[in-house]
From Swiss-Prot:
This is Glutamyl-tRNA(Gln) amidotransferase subunit A. GO terms for molecular function: ATP binding; glutaminyl-tRNA synthase (glutamine-hydrolyzing) activity. The keyword Disulfide bond does not apply. GO terms for biological process: translation.
Length: 492
């Protein structure tokens, strides 16, 4: 039995039944990391000793007959922009290469309360700015389904780790699709919660009005378990919503009869990959056969979502990243002439090309003479995008679309063309602009590469998305497929 291939809820059954120990499970995943990390490159930092200590502590609790939380003993990976006390939080950037946070993010505290086994920190696009994990300052993570292709981004390391079996569950962050798009590319489940449902305390900020932490898991049941663990109000995060969190597993009902599903026509353009379109429409047929009502709808301001996002997100990033100046922490350029020269050289050498591009774009949008013409106008159109969703949800319970316009692309195919790269998130970023929940679920394969479908819900309707995803997975087995086994050696 390959423990690293199982779901968290199945592993819990084995742990409680004493059929396997937490230490055995931890070693199984660590051995798997040894096998595949040479080709997948999912981890920036691995904490073997810490993971084994955590697993041993869970085994002692089991031996003493104590009741354990639902995720006790489950190996987790954490995206490297989420603070974990004692381990580096680099954001895959040279400018933070040596920064070790002295505190845990709220979500990490919650995972520790669950007695999970935290394996380490996963690779990402630098400061979460990217859609392929090629913008990491360290190395490019590779897709377990085809190492010549990207895993998506910016949470590519987390998605690849879950898909490859080098983690059972993982946390990522989603600013414009950074959980859902890699989930689609790697054939796993990814949830972007409603803005404010999960605390951002301890998440290194990219765009503060858009960022959300969420889970990447093997199936929808695991997703619900992780959501139960990480959601909830946090007084340390001013954007955290003081709302009672339901038991998300209560929504795992195999019944979609009477559910009203909207298909936004703007998310099915003529340019959509034919294979992706076919997979999504096959998924639609599954819901129709099970008694759901499906109808086309319109989100007319969708065409403005990409330019609006690439004004608002870089503007917020240019402000958030101003704190990295070489003075307090992170990279400091040596042999500078004066303080101003140190600021300039440290930032120039410490940030990668994509981060500098977005800082410049955001600074321009916020500058005198352009603020009203660009940034303020983008905020107004953002409101129109939100209203489109509100009108759609007056008629529909959920919206369904492709998660991404294509399958995972070849490494290097888009690095010279930023616009082509930005279009990878064309179906996901409006969800962040509107602050809505979105979830990607594996729906099939095109030429051996995974394709995800996206469910979009009303604010705080994560339960509806989980219900849809769970029912779909009761009728399909796409989520049970695993990447083909290939040699685990280094790839140049």
């Amino acid at each position: 039995m390959r423990l690293y291939d199982l779901t968290a809820h199945r592993l819990r059954e084995l742990l409680l039944g004493r059929e396997v120990s937490a230490a055995e499970l931890c070693r199984s995943v660590l051995n798997r990391i040894d096998e595949v990390e040479g080709r997948v490159k999912a981890y920036v930092t691995l904490d073997r000793e810490g993971a084994l200590r955590q697993a041993a502590a869970v085994d002692r609790e089991l031996q003493n007959g104590r009741e354990l939380p639902p995720l006790a003993g489950i190996p987790f990976a954490i995206k490297d922009n989420i603070c974990l006390r004692g381990l580096p939080a680099t954001c895959s950037s040279k400018i933070l290469h040596n920064w070790v946070p002295p505190y845990d993010a709220t979500v990490v505290e919650k995972l520790k309360d669950q007695q999970t086994v935290i394996l380490g920190k996963t690779n990402m696009d630098e400061f979460a700015m990217g859609s392929s994990t090629e913008h990491s300052a360290f190395f490019t993570t590779r897709n377990p389904w085809d190492p010549k292709r990207v895993p998506g981004g910016s949470s590519g390391g987390s998605a690849a780790a879950v898909a490859a079996g080098s983690a059972i569950c993982a946390l990522g962050s989603d600013t414009g699709g950074s959980i859902r798009q890699p989930a689609s590319f790697c054939g796993v489940v990814g949830m972007k919660p409603t803005y404010g449902l999960v605390s951002r305390y301890g998440l290194v900020a990219f765009a503060s009005s858009l960022d959300q932490i969420g889970p990447l898991t093997r199936d929808v049941t695991d997703c619900a378990l992780v959501m139960n663990a990480i959601c909830g109000h946090d007084h340390r995060d001013s954007t955290s919503v003081p709302k009672e969190v339901p038991d998300f597993t209560s929504f795992l009902v195999d019944d979609v009869k009477g559910m009203r599903i909207g298909l936004p026509r703007e998310y099915f353009p003529a340019e959509l990959d034919d294979g992706v379109r076919r997979i999504v429409m096959e998924a639609v047929s599954v819901f129709e056969e099970r008694g759901a009502y499906v109808e086309e709808t319109s989100l007319p301001h969708t065409e403005y979502a990409l330019p609006v996002y690439y004004l608002i997100a870089p503007a917020e990033a240019s402000s958030n990243l101003a704190r990295y100046d070489g003075v307090r922490y992170g990279y400091r350029a040596p042999e500078c002439e004066d303080v101003l020269d140190m600021f300039r050289v440290s930032r120039s050498r410490g940030f990668g090309a994509e981060v500098k591009r977005r800082i410049m774009l955001g600074t321009y949008a916020l500058s005198a003479g352009y603020y009203d013409a660009y940034y303020l106008k983008a905020l107004k159109v953002r409101t129109l995008i939100r209203r489109d969703f509100e009108e759609a949800f007056e008629k529909f319970d959920v919206l369904l679309s492709p998660t991404a316009p294509e399958t995972a692309f070849i490494i290097g195919a888009k690095t010279e063309d930023p616009i082509r790269m930005y279009l990878s998130d064309i179906f996901t970023l409006a969800v962040n602009l509107a602050g809505l929940p979105g979830m990607s679920v594996p729906a099939g394969f095109v030429a051996g590469l995974p394709v995800g479908i996206q469910f979009i819900g009303k604010p705080f309707a994560e339960g509806t998305l989980l219900r849809m995803g769970y029912a779909f997975q009761q009728s399909t087995d796409h989520h049970r497929q695993r990447p083909p086994e290939t040699p685990g050696g280094e790839i140049s």
